[in-house]
Amino acid sequence: MTAHAAALAAADAPAPVDRSPGALGWPVTAALRALAMDGVEQAKSGHPGAPMGMAEIAAVLWREHLRHNPADPSWPDRDRFVLSNGHGSMLIYALLHLTGYDLPIAELKRFRQLHSRTPGHPELGMTPGVETTTGPLGQGLANAVGMAIAEKTLAAQFNRPGLSIVDHRTFVFLGDGCLMEGVSHEACSLAGRLGLGKLVAFYDDNGISIDGKVEEWFPDDTPARFAAYGWHVIRNVDGHDPAMLRDAVEAALSETGKPTLICCKTTIGRGAPTKEGHQDTHGAPLGAEEIARTRAAMGWDHAPFEVPEDIYALWDARRSGAARQSAWDARMEAYERAYPAEAAEFRRRLKGDLSPAFAATYAAALKATVEKAETVATRKASQLALAALAPAVPEFLGGSADLAHSNLTTFPGAVPITRDPAGNQIFYGVREFGMSAIANGIALHGGFIPFVATFLVFSDYARNAMRMSALMGQRVIYILTHDSIGLGEDGPTHQPVEHVESLRLIPNLDVWRPADTVETLAAWHAALTRTNGPSAFILSRQNLPCWPRDAAQIEGIEAGAYVLRESEGLARAVLVATGSEVKLAAAAADLLDTAGIPTRIVSMPCRERFEALTETERAALFPKGVPVVAVEAGVTRGWRGLSGTRADGIIAIGIDRFGESAPEKDLWPLFGFTPEAVADAVRRAVG
């Protein structure tokens, strides 16, 4: 070949691929981008843009700083990692696979397929290493705040000089969408106030969302916003420069008094020659042609889902993770020798078991509650239950959305964490959504049983976080007071009508509407002993009488429904009621008994538990052919279709319109909630 021909051939040859850190050809990030592209392409749906844009951020964090052990995803002192922008799920699946978790390549090939371990958005319990279910934007960030609160509080409660058994960080990835959601304001404002120095957030500032360039609708000065919250803000980090990222992470780790936001300027879909930086990469496959071009640009000449062993070796965290956990195990053993009682308590709380003292404490509280038979509002009954049970539940970490003295969530021994880092009470401020999503993070972290509180009518603000509690099966307790038109003068803006029925629509959420002090205490017992889902308490503002019961009836409370008062003679009708309307049902039954219509009263504090009973158990409450009249101060639709009764049909007395502003005494008769009106409905049903 002549010199001229050789020069021409050299000019036509592809340029050598730069494989240095930060370059497209860096094998560490090329593997992440390739797996993200391949997974979305094979599924024919998904979001490749964020994983491709955050590859360098992920590489620096996961390879150099994240303390975790792929062989034991539940190691108590692991760092927590949350992908708040959960649509970019192929990023976390690729990270978990490459670092050595039990997530084989076959599962990445089944991305978004039925019964795979790689669902469209990360789901708790589906994939080892996934700390929380994310997808509803902003909530992962709030979960991370909750995890950081739990870490800080647990450390204050259990660490001893020279023996720190709780010492880990919470890292969270988030995007523009997370920051546009209001829950991010609620959670991050509180995080700054609480000085969560072990919380580090990475902001993927790529300027793109589904509709295009976010500058048209999200021009906020995000760094200034977070500085105002009291965060440590690291600005203008090139999200594709490993050296800058490394410096930023080290600066974040050196800040112990404030949470840190690292603002990373990135390009969505980085590496895709014709699509990077464009909204098309956000939520759709790149296509075979674009993927081929991207592979060429990265110098990635491997087949789809193929990763060479030498690149796996660059990612493998099993040895370093095992060493870190081994060091913690040694520290834990020393702690057990020095503080055996505290060590046993620590392990119990992380396991989620109730204390050995709980059963006896509850039994004593139940005996006292039955004997006192106090006439109080059920919100007060809840406070009494808290006070009685709290000494045996040191893992309580609860609070209210600026309504502690209305929801009655304070109790003897409640200490705000702002005054004592080892406390057990959180003043959340008016942040219902943030409060509830933070509580999910506290529950997910382990070591605590969170409870939160607001007015029932404002549960709408918290609803999606409540749904996430149920979806993830987390033991979070929601105290929702001022439950009906019974709160009176505040009017329809504050009088819940549809809310109880709406909450009952959420799968795996136990909704309790107790009638008195005994049912309220039993509801607390049921919620605390339930480990696979949340519970909501619907509580009255007005005082309610305490009903006499025998042991079998008390046991029936936690079954969800039971005969509170049997008819004199064979029942010709059944009145079923909840909460404050049990009192009304009893008064109506008195009128009916006098009129020669024997009427059974069934109290149904938890419809979800009633519906879980066997057909035989349900039939024992509602005999076949006996008319049933349901009474509840809310919408009637759910009662009309109540499953499990053997009645031919149910007549529901409720409120199917909004309330009125007036004294309570004027509202009940206005809406037909009188003994006479209920008795008349039963008479019509009996015929």
Swiss-Prot record:
<feature type="binding site">
    <location>
        <position position="494"/>
    </location>
    <ligand>
        <name>substrate</name>
    </ligand>
</feature>
<feature type="binding site">
    <location>
        <position position="458"/>
    </location>
    <ligand>
        <name>thiamine diphosphate</name>
    </ligand>
</feature>
<feature type="active site" description="Proton donor">
    <location>
        <position position="432"/>
    </location>
</feature>
<dbReference type="InterPro" id="IPR049557">
    <property type="entry name" value="Transketolase_CS"/>
</dbReference>
<feature type="binding site">
    <location>
        <position position="282"/>
    </location>
    <ligand>
        <name>thiamine diphosphate</name>
    </ligand>
</feature>
<dbReference type="GO" id="GO:0006098">
    <property type="term" value="P:pentose-phosphate shunt"/>
</dbReference>
<feature type="binding site">
    <location>
        <position position="379"/>
    </location>
    <ligand>
        <name>substrate</name>
    </ligand>
</feature>
<keyword id="KW-0460">Magnesium</keyword>
<feature type="binding site">
    <location>
        <position position="177"/>
    </location>
    <ligand>
        <name>thiamine diphosphate</name>
    </ligand>
</feature>
<dbReference type="GO" id="GO:0046872">
    <property type="term" value="F:metal ion binding"/>
</dbReference>
<feature type="binding site">
    <location>
        <position position="47"/>
    </location>
    <ligand>
        <name>substrate</name>
    </ligand>
</feature>
<comment type="similarity">
    <text>Belongs to the transketolase family.</text>
</comment>
<feature type="binding site">
    <location>
        <position position="282"/>
    </location>
    <ligand>
        <name>substrate</name>
    </ligand>
</feature>
<keyword id="KW-0808">Transferase</keyword>
<feature type="binding site">
    <location>
        <position position="541"/>
    </location>
    <ligand>
        <name>substrate</name>
    </ligand>
</feature>
<feature type="binding site">
    <location>
        <position position="490"/>
    </location>
    <ligand>
        <name>substrate</name>
    </ligand>
</feature>
<feature type="binding site">
    <location>
        <position position="482"/>
    </location>
    <ligand>
        <name>substrate</name>
    </ligand>
</feature>
<feature type="binding site">
    <location>
        <position position="206"/>
    </location>
    <ligand>
        <name>thiamine diphosphate</name>
    </ligand>
</feature>
<feature type="site" description="Important for catalytic activity">
    <location>
        <position position="47"/>
    </location>
</feature>
<comment type="function">
    <text>Catalyzes the transfer of a two-carbon ketol group from a ketose donor to an aldose acceptor, via a covalent intermediate with the cofactor thiamine pyrophosphate.</text>
</comment>
<feature type="binding site">
    <location>
        <position position="176"/>
    </location>
    <ligand>
        <name>Mg(2+)</name>
    </ligand>
</feature>
<keyword id="KW-0786">Thiamine pyrophosphate</keyword>
<feature type="binding site">
    <location>
        <begin position="135"/>
        <end position="137"/>
    </location>
    <ligand>
        <name>thiamine diphosphate</name>
    </ligand>
</feature>
<feature type="binding site">
    <location>
        <position position="406"/>
    </location>
    <ligand>
        <name>substrate</name>
    </ligand>
</feature>
<dbReference type="Pfam" id="PF00456">
    <property type="entry name" value="Transketolase_N"/>
</dbReference>
<dbReference type="InterPro" id="IPR009014">
    <property type="entry name" value="Transketo_C/PFOR_II"/>
</dbReference>
<feature type="binding site">
    <location>
        <position position="208"/>
    </location>
    <ligand>
        <name>Mg(2+)</name>
    </ligand>
</feature>
<dbReference type="InterPro" id="IPR005474">
    <property type="entry name" value="Transketolase_N"/>
</dbReference>
<feature type="site" description="Important for catalytic activity">
    <location>
        <position position="282"/>
    </location>
</feature>
<feature type="binding site">
    <location>
        <position position="87"/>
    </location>
    <ligand>
        <name>thiamine diphosphate</name>
    </ligand>
</feature>
<dbReference type="GO" id="GO:0004802">
    <property type="term" value="F:transketolase activity"/>
</dbReference>
<keyword id="KW-0479">Metal-binding</keyword>
<dbReference type="InterPro" id="IPR005475">
    <property type="entry name" value="Transketolase-like_Pyr-bd"/>
</dbReference>
<dbReference type="Pfam" id="PF22613">
    <property type="entry name" value="Transketolase_C_1"/>
</dbReference>
<dbReference type="InterPro" id="IPR029061">
    <property type="entry name" value="THDP-binding"/>
</dbReference>
<feature type="binding site">
    <location>
        <position position="206"/>
    </location>
    <ligand>
        <name>Mg(2+)</name>
    </ligand>
</feature>
<dbReference type="InterPro" id="IPR055152">
    <property type="entry name" value="Transketolase-like_C_2"/>
</dbReference>
<dbReference type="InterPro" id="IPR005478">
    <property type="entry name" value="Transketolase_bac-like"/>
</dbReference>
<dbReference type="Pfam" id="PF02779">
    <property type="entry name" value="Transket_pyr"/>
</dbReference>
<dbReference type="InterPro" id="IPR033247">
    <property type="entry name" value="Transketolase_fam"/>
</dbReference>
<dbReference type="GO" id="GO:0005829">
    <property type="term" value="C:cytosol"/>
</dbReference>
<protein>
    <recommendedName>
        <fullName>Transketolase 2</fullName>
        <ecNumber>2.2.1.1</ecNumber>
    </recommendedName>
</protein>
